[in-house]
Design a protein with these regions (language model features):
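Active-site core of glycosidic bond-cleaving carbohydrate-active enzymes
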Residues: 2-7, 11, 45-202
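Short, surface-exposed recognition loops and adjoining beta-strand edges that mediate ligand/DNA contacts
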Residues: 30-54
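Active-site neighborhood of glycoside hydrolase catalytic domains
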Residues: 1-37, 70-72
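Aromatic side chains
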Residues: 20, 40-41, 176
């Protein structure tokens, strides 16, 4: 949905804007109806999976970052973020590693033999942390970031930051660029400081 919003902002042809606006208008209510379960957004509409996906609202983060309208209501975004924080981070290995890509609400794996759902992707975690800051959860963001950074540095990976680390002590995809998302945390914190400074001067 967020790419549609961005396309509407960037599009310079009336036909394109009309098409994208139609798609967006049709999609927004369906997204809520099919995926919202009262606490977080489901992985999909048909499988019945209970998995809490760590980056389920990355589009909402980018929309706010770009100054675009929200994709989902802010109260639902906050509820989903709190669920992600507790399920994927706090309850997953007691918060030692960072947020797993996708686990049940109690932090347990849906499939213990799965690979990607139980990995902690450094870049996804930093993006999630930036979103937490954006939504007023800075303490939680710094705890999450700290856990991931500690895993990287304590395991001697600071000059070969991996894409993924696991609770079993393995890692893969060294020097993966998505970890540069850590700068998004600074970007959001800095933006909040500028807003606060501007408000103070206005008063």
């Amino acid at each position: 949905l967020q790419p549609l919003r961005a396309s509407l902002r960037a599009g310079d042809l009336a036909v394109q804007k009309s098409t994208y606006q139609t798609w967006l208008t049709q999609s927004l209510p369906v997204y809520q109806e099919k995926l919202w379960n009262g606490q977080y957004f489901r992985l999909d509409s048909d499988s019945g999976s209970q998995v809490v996906m760590a980056d389920q609202l990355c589009g909402q983060f980018y929309a706010r970052l770009l100054g675009l309208p929200d994709i989902v209501p802010s109260d639902r975004a906050l509820s989903a973020l709190q669920t992600v924080y507790h399920a994927c981070f706090v309850k997953f290995c007691n918060g030692e590693f960072g947020a797993a890509n996708g686990v049940r609400p109690d932090g347990s794996p849906e499939n213990p033999n799965a690979t990607h759902p139980l990995e902690v992707w450094t870049g996804i975690n930093f993006g999630l942390a930036a979103f937490l800051v954006q939504m007023g959860m800075q303490d939680e963001a710094l705890k999450l970031t700290g856990a991931v950074v500690q895993q990287i540095y304590h395991n001697g990976l600071q000059f070969r930051t991996p894409e993924a680390i696991t609770a079993s002590g393995t890692f893969r995809a060294s020097t993966y660029l998505r970890a540069m998302a850590i700068w998004a945390i600074y970007l959001v914190i800095d933006a909040k400081k500028h807003i606060l400074h501007s408000d103070t001067n206005t008063v």
